[in-house]
Every structure is written in structure tokens, then in C-alpha cells.
Amino acid sequence: MENGEYAFILKKGYDSREVINTYRDQIESKTGEWLESIQDLDDDLLIEKAAYEYIMENAEYDFDTFNTMFQYTNGVPVEEVNPYNENCQNIVGFFMDGKVVCGGYARTMQYLCNVAGLDSLYIESGRREHAWNMVKLYDDWYCIDVTWMDTGGDATPESKIVNKSYETFRSNDDTSTNDPMSGMFRYHALGGLIQKMGPKCVKDTVEKP
């Protein structure tokens, strides 16, 4: 970003300039509409809420791509795997067709928070099974999982996946289950680098100054 202008870098090795321009135009247009809709909000918590509600209203979990990913990682031959949505893990997937998996949810949340003036980080679990966010509200950082909020239908302030400490996030996980969906959605083990150098999320209640 320079002088208030954002540059979109789309890592799409085989797309034409026309296709990339289409992505850019759509993202800029939708972003502008959303920013206009929240221009009267001046509170961190309300801006964050507007971001995740916008995502939940316009995103759909891409179960077809999830199944493809799960089959591939379990040794199913590539030719037997379903078609794969290559944009499911980024903001292009959200803004173009609304179909994403956890990476797309988290990248979009990070993007919307950032363009609206909130600090936000994209977080991957230690073995990259899942992605979520940390968002800075006022002077403290909190964990939030928009994927599980959308697919689990729980976006209330009382939820254990909305603006909670990292320890609360970890306490939600049940790694004893054999259900692959539970593991992919809810595995919140931090990678070593972010655990050592990242912001600390230690509060379970947002405290306004």
C-alpha cells in the first residue's frame, strides 16, 4: 500500500491479462461497495462484525473441493479426484463465485479487516490442516474462526470461536475423533513461528477502552 492505494497481487501463473483484470475489477468493485456500507462505523468491534457477517452472507463452503483435497491426501489417484477450485484458498474465490474453504474464509477476513483499518493476521495450524484469524480490537488480539462460524452456524458473542483467547480455541478441539471434517475445521494448533513470535491472545472478553 502506498499513499492509501492498494495493489492486488494475484498469483495466477496461467491466467491471461484479461482474466486477471476481471478478478481485479470485481474485487475492487465489491470492496468499494462494502466499505461504503460501513463508512459510518467507527468502532473496532462493529467493523469486525460487519466483516464476518459480509463473508457469511456471501460465502459457501466448497465441499466439492474439500472432498477432492481429502481424497488426494489419502492417496487416491489424481485422475479419480473431483475437479478442484484453485481459488478456494484466497479472496478471488470469495469475490468471484463465493465458494471457499478455510483458507479462503481466513484470507477474506484478513483482507476486509485490513482495508477497513483493523489489524488482522492469517493463521495456519502447525500442520496446515486449517486456517483462521487473529484480529486486533482496541489494544488486544483475539482469535476468530469464520469458517466454523459459517458452517457451524454460531456467530454469537458467546461462541467459543468468536474473539476468544488461543487457549479457549485449543480447548474446543477434539483430536480424538475419526471424523475428518472435525479435524479439518477445528484443528487450532499454532505453528512454531507464530507461537513464539506472534501476538498473544489471552483474553476471552473484548474490553473496550
Predicted regions and their residues:
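Intrinsically disordered, low-complexity N-terminal segments that are enriched in acidic
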Residues: 1-11, 209
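Solvent-exposed residues in well-ordered beta-strands and their adjoining turns
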Residues: 11-13, 136
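Secondary-structure boundary elements
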Residues: 14-93
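Alpha-helix capping and helix-loop boundary segments enriched in small/acidic/polar residues
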Residues: 18, 22, 97-100, 124
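A short, highly charged nucleic-acid-interacting micro-segment common to nuclease
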Residues: 91-105
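Hydrophobic/aromatic-rich core segments of domains that either
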Residues: 103-170
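Low-complexity, Gly/Ser/Thr/Pro-rich intrinsically disordered linker/tail segments
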Residues: 155-209
